[in-house]
């Protein structure tokens, strides 16, 4: 018969499954073991974990829990302890952490090696008697699916790993002192694991909670998009393999802080690339990228004195119009104006690892600056290759080339004509006027603050079939062990 623990586990897994079925993420931040170790190591430093180790009350613990658990009643313990003036940890180090998948699914095992040198003073010898102590604290990172709040990650089951304790005398002295040191070490064997559990484990749990809170704050940092901004929120966390995965929703806000669009449900499941020893990966859906591009490239209008700005293009336009209507071409003076209006917002597409931006353009040609009506109006479906690149922690989009995929004659004062006759020159004009302006807006890039916050100087981008992926570009530089 299934026990209550099995029932609780099944309920937790079912709750997590229902949450995931209801909320489809539009972005995912995947953190590999290297990032987890680095962030937790830093939190242990910030929580003064080594100071806690140095303050372990070794002597008191030996009195309270002697070898075998027998109370101190004038036994051998008292005989040993009366020869000790003081006993304390002299130096303490927390060595390189390890993060591995647990035997239980959706859990991570964190191993924290502890390295200490302790010493005691005795009237039997003038020098301090020192011995080396090593042990390993272990804890489990798991998902808390309790009904009291949203699913979150917690660290639990912290204790010293079985059989990891090693105590060794550093320097041999006289026979009597060596025998005393051996008795002290024997008394520490049952005491030290309890000290680590009671004194250090709460610090480890607090450090993990601090790390998790920092990660949640990190993903919520607003991303500036011209006058708008993009914000992410945690939908639910997950543990897969040796990674922590934060599934995110997103929202677009205007300059007043009003939400203009929610992205809590992706149209399709995101393609999740494997980390392959990459410290972190941020996957952002096509829908969110599309909205970000649209926020930067809002509809706008350009009025250009073509003969002054692009004289060669003005000459070619006049020649092309002359093939349609010579009288209309003759009307084009030195103040001829081309008006370009972008309609709505651009459409962003990802197709087999390649990105494209499509936009609707209205183009009008006026014979002079005094003319009130255009010679003709064209509707153009244009597209450009979109290429992402990074500069430090800035993500930048650049539009390469532009093509007029479809041209329609919307209005004409020179009679009906086939607009494809003007396709080459119209594409040239759009490329020369519109593309530099839009790339100028995109050139400032989008700051991705989590890159430096996770310990990297730069990022690199790539595309899957339906998402933009950011990964670190610089080599990983692990922090030094926690020591004092």
Swiss-Prot record:
Coiled coil: none
Carbohydrate-modified residues: 48, 264, 401
GO biological process: innate immune response in mucosa; negative regulation of toll-like receptor 4 signaling pathway
InterPro entries with a match to the protein in the record: Bactericidal_perm-incr_a/b_dom, Bpifb1, Lipid-bd_serum_glycop_C, Lipid-bd_serum_glycop_N
One MF annotation (Gene Ontology) recorded for this entry: lipid binding
Signal peptide, first to last residue: 1-21
Stored CDD domains: BPI1, BPI2
Tissue expression as described in the entry: Detected in duodenum mucosal crypts of cholera patients, near Paneth cells (at protein level). Detected in trachea, nasal septal epithelium and lung.
Function: May play a role in innate immunity in mouth, nose and lungs. Binds bacterial lipopolysaccharide (LPS) and modulates the cellular responses to LPS.
Record protein name field: BPI fold-containing family B member 1
Gene name of the record: BPIFB1
């Amino acid at each position: 018969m299934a026990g209550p623990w099995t029932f609780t586990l099944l309920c937790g897994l079912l709750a997590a499954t229902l949450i995931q079925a209801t909320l489809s993420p539009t972005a995912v931040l995947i953190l590999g073991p290297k990032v987890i170790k680095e962030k937790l190591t830093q939190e242990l430093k910030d929580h003064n974990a080594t100071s806690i180790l140095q303050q372990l009350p070794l002597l008191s613990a030996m009195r309270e829990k002697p070898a075998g658990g027998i109370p101190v009643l004038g036994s051998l313990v008292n005989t040993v302890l009366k020869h000790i003036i003081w006993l304390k940890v002299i130096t303490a180090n927390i060595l390189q952490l390890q993060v591995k998948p647990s035997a239980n699914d959706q859990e991570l095992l964190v191993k924290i090696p502890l390295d200490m040198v302790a010493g005691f003073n005795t009237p039997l010898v003038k020098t301090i008697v020192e011995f080396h102590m090593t042990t390993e604290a272990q804890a489990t990172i798991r998902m808390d699916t309790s009904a009291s709040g949203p699913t979150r990650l917690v660290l639990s089951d912290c204790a010293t790993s079985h059989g990891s304790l090693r105590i060794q005398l550093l320097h041999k002295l006289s026979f009597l002192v060596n025998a005393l040191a051996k008795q002290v070490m024997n008394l520490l064997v049952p005491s030290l694991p309890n000290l680590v559990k009671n004194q250090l484990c709460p610090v480890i749990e607090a450090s993990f909670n601090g790390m998790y809170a920092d990660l949640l704050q990190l993903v919520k940092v607003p991303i500036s998009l011209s006058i708008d901004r993009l914000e992410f929120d945690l939908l639910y966390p997950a543990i897969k393999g040796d990674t922590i995965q934060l599934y995110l929703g997103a929202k677009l806000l205007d300059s007043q802080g009003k939400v203009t669009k929610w992205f809590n449900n992706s149209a399709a499941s995101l393609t999740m690339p494997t980390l392959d020893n990459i410290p972190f990966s941020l996957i952002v859906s096509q829908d969110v990228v599309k909205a970000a591009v649209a926020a930067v490239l809002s509809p706008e209008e350009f009025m250009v004195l073509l003969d002054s700005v692009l004289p060669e293009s003005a000459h070619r336009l006049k020649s092309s119009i002359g093939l349609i209507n010579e009288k209309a071409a003759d009307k084009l003076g030195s103040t001829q104006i081309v008006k370009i209006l972008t309609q709505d917002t651009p459409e962003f597409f990802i197709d087999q690892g390649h990105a494209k931006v499509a936009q609707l353009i209205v183009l009008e040609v006026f014979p002079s600056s005094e003319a009130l009506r255009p010679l003709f109006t064209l509707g153009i479906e244009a597209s450009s290759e979109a290429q992402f690149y990074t500069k430090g922690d800035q993500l930048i989009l650049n539009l390469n080339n532009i093509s007029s995929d479809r041209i329609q004659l919307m209005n004409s004062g020179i009679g009906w004509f086939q607009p494809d006759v003007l396709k080459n020159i119209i594409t040239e004009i759009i490329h020369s006027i519109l593309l530099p302006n839009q790339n100028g807006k995109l050139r400032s890039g989008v700051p991705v603050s989590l890159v430096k916050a996770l310990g990297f100087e730069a990022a690199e981008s790539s595309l899957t079939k339906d998402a933009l992926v950011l990964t670190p570009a610089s080599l990983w530089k692990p922090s030094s062990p926690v020591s004092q």
